[in-house]
Curated annotation (Swiss-Prot):
<dbReference type="InterPro" id="IPR038732">
    <property type="entry name" value="HpyO/CreE_NAD-binding"/>
</dbReference>
<protein>
    <recommendedName>
        <fullName>Uncharacterized protein YdhS</fullName>
    </recommendedName>
</protein>
<dbReference type="Pfam" id="PF13454">
    <property type="entry name" value="NAD_binding_9"/>
</dbReference>
<dbReference type="InterPro" id="IPR036188">
    <property type="entry name" value="FAD/NAD-bd_sf"/>
</dbReference>
<dbReference type="InterPro" id="IPR052189">
    <property type="entry name" value="L-asp_N-monooxygenase_NS-form"/>
</dbReference>
Length: 534
């Protein structure tokens, strides 16, 4: 019986276990989870989130395990759902709900998987509150070290499914939080001048986490939200900061599963890749232009799409939003999106960009360094803005804070400096200086390199190759050095973002988990293409 270690029991680890059970061959599986409860995952745990924080994914998009998320919700007691402000009679498969509820779903599915595994004669051990502190490959197998006094054993395959990586809480102070997941949920933030770097959903969630310490959101039957500030919190002022000062749009209605693309097909992209890296980005952009024109000729004409190139397309995409007050734009966009949802109307240009991002991602490892930078500054920002559209409820709460005179948005521009001091954080632009009593960095996950791997033994072994990015096969097993090949499946998202910049979400977790499970029975037939620079 092969011995498998799964490090991390969040969504990627859960989908890996799910896929292993489909193979029917009994295995010995040890699951290591540093949190108190395996099967929840950091993004959905009650330790890292408040009831206010919404998951940016609906049931219709979540790969089901035993049942869909919606089916699971419909089986819950009314009183339990009401604790999260959810009414059973209003549930539907496109609804955005509190992250903690989604964590409960995954916990339930995980426990059922463990039971099923044992019924299928798998040997399963689950270690909770158990942090893997080191991982090393020896001739005998993969050895793990943990913070618990566990018997020494070796594994045939170790699956690294550790998910997002945020700064330790030890790096946070009373006045500075390096991420919203570095102690902010437990912290008492006084009514003061609060700065939040980032205007994505993470930034908005951080603002909500602060705001609910100083008042409450009230929603009427017409979905209008107001914020009632506590009398003792008059000094609360929240500023969202970013280079552009642009807010994300509200999540829009579209057909799911996605309709196929007509021009930017796998065949067309592979043909361009085969022509070589020189000019690849510009050639693919011409395909993108044709795809957008096919989907929405009117919008294409309105933005003069034919006159745009890789570098100017992003400017055209954001132009109208930059000219408007961000809150006015958000209110207008919210009204449009909600109308489209009621009418089940799809905006063609938004939908085609959404479908393009995963297809176009395939060219990223094949770009030369110059074009990779152009892609990151242009098209990538458009794609991210489009797929990271946020729940309407988050926009309503943001607008409620604005009506209450609490929240503001500041565009810093491209050139600014940040000074983190003991009592405050100061940001300086060419023209101004901004000081904050409390500062929260909510810019999201950054790509990580070999030097950032938290397991000293594995890190040292990989550093001998001289590669800055882990070299993984199509099943995500490490390919270099030779003595490691096929023995560690490296599915930790932050280390995959260099050549998969849009790898995120539960669909990606399921796909990676399925691929890593294949490593148990069949070695990778080929390595993934990866960046030759970074």
């Amino acid at each position: 019986m092969k011995k498998i270690a799964i490090v991390g029991a969040g969504p990627t680890g859960i989908y890996t276990l799910f896929s292993l059970l489909q193979q029917q061959t009994p295995l010995s599986i040890s699951i290591f989870e540093q949190a108190d409860e395996a099967g929840v995952g950091m993004p959905y745990s009650d330790e890292e989130n408040s009831k206010m924080m919404l998951a940016n994914i609906a049931s219709i998009e979540i790969p089901p395990i035993y049942c869909t998320y919606l089916e699971w919700l419909q089986k819950q007691e009314d009183s339990h759902l009401q604790r999260y402000g959810v009414k059973k009679e209003t549930l539907h498969d496109r609804q955005f709900l509190p992250r903690i509820l989604l964590g409960e779903y995954f916990r339930d599915q995980f426990l059922r998987l463990v039971d099923q595994a044992r019924q299928q004669k798998f040997a399963v051990a689950v270690y909770e509150s158990c942090q893997v502190t080191d991982l090393q490959i020896t001739n005998a197998g993969v050895m793990l070290a943990t913070n618990q006094d566990l018997p020494s054993e070796t594994f045939d395959l170790a699956v690294i499914a550790t998910g997002h990586v945020w700064p330790d809480e030890e790096e946070a102070t009373r006045t500075y939080f390096p991420s919203p997941w570095s102690g902010l949920m437990e912290a008492k933030v006084d009514a003061c001048n609060v700065g939040i770097m980032g205007t994505s959903l993470s930034g908005l969630d951080a603002a909500m986490a602060v705001a609910i310490q100083h008042g409450s959101f009230i929603e009427d039957d017409k979905q209008h939200v107001v914020f009632h500030r506590d009398n003792a919190s008059e000094k609360l002022n929240i500023t969202l900061l970013s280079r552009t000062g642009i807010l994300p749009e509200a999540d829009f209605y579209c057909p799911i599963p996605y309709e196929p693309l007509h021009i930017v097909t796998d065949q067309a992209l592979n043909a361009e890749i085969q022509k070589g890296e020189e000019g690849l980005l510009d050639r693919v952009f011409r395909l993108i232009v044709e795809e957008i024109k096919f989907a929405d000729p009117d919008w294409s004409q309105r933005i003069a799409l034919e006159s745009l190139n890789v570098d100017s397309f992003a400017q055209a995409w954001f132009a109208e939003r930059k000219q408007r007050d961000p809150f006015d734009w958000a209110e207008k966009n919210l009204q449009e999106v909600e109308r489209n949802k009621r009418e089940k109307h799809t905006v063609p240009w938004r939908y085609v960009i959404l479908r393009l991002h995963e297809a176009v991602q395939e060219i990223v490892p094949h770009l030369n360094e110059h074009d990779h930078k152009r892609f990151s500054k242009g098209l990538a920002r458009v794609f991210i803005d489009n797929y990271a559209a946020i729940p309407s409820e988050s926009i309503r709460r943001l607008l409620a804070l604005r009506e209450a005179g609490i929240i503001h948005i500041l565009a810093l521009g491209e050139d600014y400096k940040m000074e983190i001091n003991e009592s405050r954080t100061v940001l300086k632009t060419e023209d101004n200086s901004y000081s904050f009593d409390v500062f929260i960095d909510a810019r999201g996950q950054r790509p990580l390199k070999v030097k950032d791997i938290p397991f000293p033994g594995l890190r040292e072994q990989l550093q001998k190759t001289g590669d800055e990015i882990p070299d993984v096969g199509e099943d995500y097993t490490l390919q270099q050095p030779e003595d490691i090949r096929g023995r560690v499946a490296f599915g930790a998202l932050p280390w995959l973002m260099h050549d998969q910049p849009f790898v995120q979400g539960l669909t990606a977790c399921a796909e990676i988990g399925e691929a890593m499970a294949r490593a148990v029975v069949k070695p990778a037939s080929r390595a993934r293409r990866r960046l030759s620079f970074d």
